[in-house]
Amino acid sequence: MGYAATRTEERVAASLGLLASAPIEFCAGQDVAGGGVLLALPALLAMGLLAHGELYALPPGYYGLTSIFLLLALMALARIPSLEQLRYQASGEWGHLLGLDRIPEVRTLREKVQILCRQAGQAARWNTELAKQWITAEQAAEPVFYADGHVRVYHGKMTALPKHYVARQRLYQRATVDYWINAMDGQPFFYINQPVDHGLVAALREDLTPWLEANVAVSPEHQQRMDADPQVPRFTMIFDREGYSPELFEQLWERRIAVINYHRYPKEDWPAEEFHEETVELVRGVGVQLKLAERGRCAGWPREAGRSRW
């Protein structure tokens, strides 16, 4: 059975097909290597690590879906970069972290992961369900989402990806672009990967806002506000000047989606006398004093706001 395999009856039952999965049973221990990662376990569970497990399935065996998910999550926290590196870890010590006698052998773990990866489309469904759960937990009276793109450099040789400009290195390199939707405090909800990038405007029009429209529920109270006031948006999108497009803004507003964006082609500075000091409440309730000004524009009359330094 291997080193540290002490739950022999359950292992025999699993080998005979009589056990769906071994139950997780944490017990007291001293001087367990890597035990500090368990401090993050409540946070992982609160974020939904084991939620929506019905979307996946594993054949009966000693190591069930819960054990595999926990092991992969704790590996990330312990900075173990690959399954192969588990060969050099104490299997019994890691078993204590999972509430088992030992962790699976690397070959067994690979087989389990391959079974999960062969279930096409399940990862996207799981991601969608988790994102909806996080959005519901963070949703304010008027939902606001921050969209941003990040270039991810590709260092492999398997695919000849197109080149993108990498700002931090000031070079064009083979890369893909991830477009993230975040909460206002920076917590991520979901992302869409674009191997061939057509820009933030196209991503907003074709991918990000359609996903939000399909998966972000409108509360009854917010629906009442929208019915009573045609200027109340369904939700608001915030993004940088890469997404500046008056045509896109007009298309989004036709679907009751508001936009907060930097002007891509600013001209001369606005006169200082147009600015007035206002108190602005930040995400965590902290108030700051800003000097703000506002102008209207004739193209669909989006409001244009300016801010001076404070």
What label would you give each PLM region?
Residues 144, 234-236, 258:
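Structural preference for beta-strand elements that scaffold enzyme active sites
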Residues 150, 184, 242, 263-264:
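Anionic group-transfer/hydrolysis microenvironments
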Residues 1-171, 176-198, 202-229:
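Dynamic "connector" segments at or just before major functional cores
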Residues 154-157, 247, 271-272:
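Short, solvent-exposed polar/charged micro-motifs at secondary-structure junctions
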Residues 238-246, 265-268:
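Acidic, metal-coordinating catalytic cores used for nucleic-acid/nucleotide bond scission
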Residues 227-229, 233-243:
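Acidic/histidine-rich, metal-coordinating catalytic segments
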Residues 250, 255-310:
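An anionic, glycine-rich sequence signature occurring as long contiguous blocks
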